Amino acid sequence: SMEKFHPRSFNMGFSQEVLKATGGFSGLRFGEDIDMSIRIMAAGFKTCLLPEAYVFHKRRTSFRKFFKQVYNSGMARINLYLLHPHSLKLVHFLPACFVIGCLLCLLGGIFFSWYCLLPLLLLIFVFFIDSWRLNKSIKVAFLSIVAAFIQLFAYGIGFIHAVFAALILK
């Protein structure tokens, strides 16, 4: 079944009634929008996506800023789990598995056989071809590889960091 839509703060609108019933945004620095969405639904209100609504929000201007944003999202997922245990799904673990898988491929390539690098090379090839097909630009295709790895690594590392900090070493 499809998950319920959780609006994000950059495009979220709600009534004064919802604001009063939920108490508004929590003090979370990251993940505050998902926390608010969960509390809205827990208070008995419905959420929906309005595909015709036009929303503009500022994109990150560098890969460094993008990494930081996505890293914080990975950490926020564990903080959300602590507040709302039912909100953590299997899909949230995938970037962490990607990080571990990449490290195992690299270590295998260094210490065993270059064949261990084949899964990474295949993934890079798939990212490149898919982006090139969609965007018709070799430059964008190469940047897509970088962006995809940054997104997956940043979220995965943030998630792993939060698991250790909040759950294992607490």
Residue ranges, per PLM feature:
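Short, P/G- and charge-enriched loop/turn segments at secondary-structure junctions
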Residues: S1-E3
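Membrane-interface anchor segments at the N-terminal boundary of transmembrane helices
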Residues: S87-C97
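A cross-family signal for key residues in well-ordered alpha-helices
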Residues: Q16, K20, I38, I100
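Membrane-embedded multi-pass helical conduit in multi-pass membrane proteins
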Residues: F98-L169
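Conserved nucleotide-sugar donor-binding
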Residues: R8-G23
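Catalytic donor/gating beta->alpha subdomain of glycosyltransferases that bind UDP-sugars
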Residues: S26-L88
